[in-house]
Amino acid sequence: MNNQTNQQSQTQSQSQQRINFDITGWEKKSKLSTQQYLLINNLNKSTQEKPLPQKYLEDKINNDIKKEENQQLQQQQQQQQQQQQQQQSPIIENFMDNFNPKTDIDNLSDFYQWYSIIDKNNPHLHQYEWFLETIVNYSKGSNQLLSMVENCDKLVESIQTDYSNLTKKTNQLNEDCEKFFNEELKLRYIAQSIHDKLKFYNQLEIQTKKFNTTNFNVTDSTFLTSLENLENSINFMKSNSTFMESNKYLTQYGFIFSRALGLIKDYISSNLKILSRDIINAQKQLKTSVSTPTSPQLQSSSGGSPLINDFSNSTDFNDLFQHSNIRFRAFAPKLRPLCLELEKRAIGPYLSYLYDTQNIYFNNRRSILSLIMFEKLQSLSKMTDISSMIRSSSLFMIQFYENEYQIYSNFFSPPDLNNNNNNNNNNNNNDNINNSTNINNSNNTNNNNQDIINNCPAFSNILDEYSQQLYDTIRPIYIHIHSFETLCNLAHLIRNELIDDLVQKSMKYSNGFKMTIERMLQDIQERLIFIIQTYIRDEIRSYHPNSDDLDYPNKLKIYVTAESTAVDGDGNGSGNSSPTLSYKSIYSTWYPTLEKSLTCLSKLYLVLETRIFEGLAQEVVEACTFTLIQASRLLLIQQKNDPYIILDSQLFLIKNLLTLREQIAPFDINFVIIEKIVDFPNLKHSLSTLYNVGSFLTLSTNNPILSLLSPRVTNTSIDSKKDLEKELKQSIESFILSNANTIIDPLLSLLTKISVFLNQSNKNQTDPMLLSQQSFADPQRIKEIIEQVKEKASNYLPQVIDRMKLYLSISTQILLMKPIRTNIIDSFDQINQYTKKYYTEDQIKIIDLQSLKLILDKILTPSKQSNNNNNNNNNNNNNNNNNNNNNNNNNNNNNNNNNNNNKNENNENENENNSNVNSPSPQQL
């Protein structure tokens, strides 16, 4: 019974569990169908879409349509779901119908009966039981899994908590380690820094002991290292002046550093003195060996100082000079490192050690070279040719400069003397001395140090001394020269050879040689100006000609004869004609003052400044013109018996003035000087008005006191070239008028009488036709006068033409003869006009005026042969003039020839264009 009871209780419990199972809830928990998922997705998409803008309204309408379609699909899906539920609901209803008893259960049999009915009617409930059991098992497993997950979660949380705690502790440990490591590094750096800084403090005792010992000197192997340590210590103390007792240590280090540099200076000084003493002793031995009585050459020399005898020949000088150079070059590698150490540290007060060392070096070189230089310059000063002496001396000085530069470069850094400025160096030194410990502490200091090393004033000073010695040796020689040609050659040599060539080579060593050469040039130019002014006064303006100087036209005839002989000799192939003879011949035709003036100008043109040359050229041209005029007058006085002396005098003046004008044309200068003259008459008037007391009170220019305090000064310009043109024009006009009047003088008197008669007839109102009845105007009388004119023209004009051929060129002859012919023809034209107006045809035939023109044309028109001869003579004259220019002015050959050719061409053109001018201008000639 108990078993049955248990079974019934179990059965009831199972039935209760079945009754409590809600199948509707399970259906709700079941998965959705595919259509349902699609519907949900469509709804999700529609909710995720953002509203469109107003401008896309049409798209929105389309979307609404799509929404309606989706709603329809949803309704269809809902209907399908309802149908499915309806399919399932009969099972549930049937189950519920079976489950609910139709009759009441009163006893156990009713229960079993009801149960059997349920069991029969619902056979598929076993499947649900199995499924329920499975679900229950899954639920238990899930619960167990959840409990395990919870345990794992708790375990993970505990692990995470432990890990975070461990991480914090590890990070803290790492930070602490890094902190301790950084502190360790910092302490080590501080310790090392302290050690490094203490090293400079500890060096003081070490260096003090080292430099105080007697065994420590410059030759010690550790000397340079100690010097660098001292320099580093000084730089450290200077850059860390805030450290304790840094100034004290800086001062002590400075004393030790100065002592070290002093040791270097003393060592170099002692070695250089020993070297110089050995070289001087060697020179004395060589001097003694050369000066022994066994040398006949030296026995004849004059006595004097034992160190200054005649051993200045080239062999002795070269031996001494080369011996000293070789010894210094061989000794340089020993001292050069120490000299470079001084140059590196030549800053502030330590610059004096470098300067002292350089001065010691130059003093030793000076003691060796003084005797050698003196003897060499004395030997050069004994040369007879001053130009060769100056050239040789300059070449020697350039070689000497180069040699000294190379020797100096073997000891010290090579100086760059092109940028040498002693004043700037002195200023830099004073600024640096104020800073007692400034050693290599900035880039600017390094630059200044390099500038000081490159700019060596002592090197320039010693070269300047020897340049001054050269100047003192040569100046007494050229200052006593009285020949201006020699002075011109010297000035030309200095300007064109020495300054342009040698001086440029010496500029990289010293400016002293350039200054010396320029001083020499200035002295020579000053001496030359003085000599030229004396020469102008004594040799040109005050020149007194002798009889040979005024032997004209014989000098010209001799020249023409010599030229014709030379031409004939060339034509016969003899080849005996000499160009030098031709040059001397053309010079012999010039008046001496003309030759001297042109020689003076050509020499001065290239050696003086333009401003100075213009003033001297004006004086020379004015003096030469004056002497030519005086010579033409003396020619008239000395040769009174010559009937053609007036003609010779005029042609002499024209020829020489033309030559002077032609020869000064190539000089591109202004022959004008401006003189300031005080108006002394005005001063005299002011002094005379001082007695008028009332005039003192006038506030005007008439006040005598104001006139005395501010005298009137007038500027007067003197143009010698214009004066020359004026004199030339006057001489040409005088020549033309005198020669024309000489021929037509009777005709001119006749014309004067005719003009007087016609004027009287006009006043008296008489018949002018009575002119032919006058005794002075009788046709026969006029014919006699014309015959006289013809005779003079036939006799006098050929003489004039012959003289002109001697003096002038063919082009100048034509220019001068045209106005003479024109004046003669004009006078005859006036007679012809009078005869046509006041004479009958028969009377005109008696007078016969046309024959005079034929005679003039025959006389004044030269033949072809004479033209050829004159052209040859003219060409020879031009060539000789050009050669004269070449000899007198070496650098203006092309200019003179071109100017002469241009002048001849211009003269020919002007001759053609001015054939109707009565008197030609000087420019036409």
Swiss-Prot record:
InterPro entries per the UniProt record, alphabetical: COG3_C, COG3_N, COG_su3
Complex and partners: Component of the conserved oligomeric Golgi complex which is composed of eight different subunits and is required for normal Golgi morphology and localization.
GO CC term (a single one): Golgi transport complex
Localization per Swiss-Prot or TrEMBL: Golgi apparatus membrane
Organism of provenance: Dictyostelium discoideum
Name assigned to this protein: Conserved oligomeric Golgi complex subunit 3
UniProt record, GO biological process: Golgi organization; intra-Golgi vesicle-mediated transport; intracellular protein transport
Bias (Low complexity): 71-88, 418-446, 867-904
Highest taxon of the lineage: Eukaryota
Annotated region (Disordered), positions in chain: 68-88, 416-446, 863-925
Keywords, ordered alphabetically: Golgi apparatus, Membrane, Protein transport, Transport
Membrane topology according to the record: Peripheral membrane protein
Functional description taken from the UniProt entry: Required for normal Golgi function.
PANTHER family on file: CONSERVED OLIGOMERIC GOLGI COMPLEX COMPONENT 3, CONSERVED OLIGOMERIC GOLGI COMPLEX SUBUNIT 3
Family classification: Belongs to the COG3 family.
Disulfide pattern: none
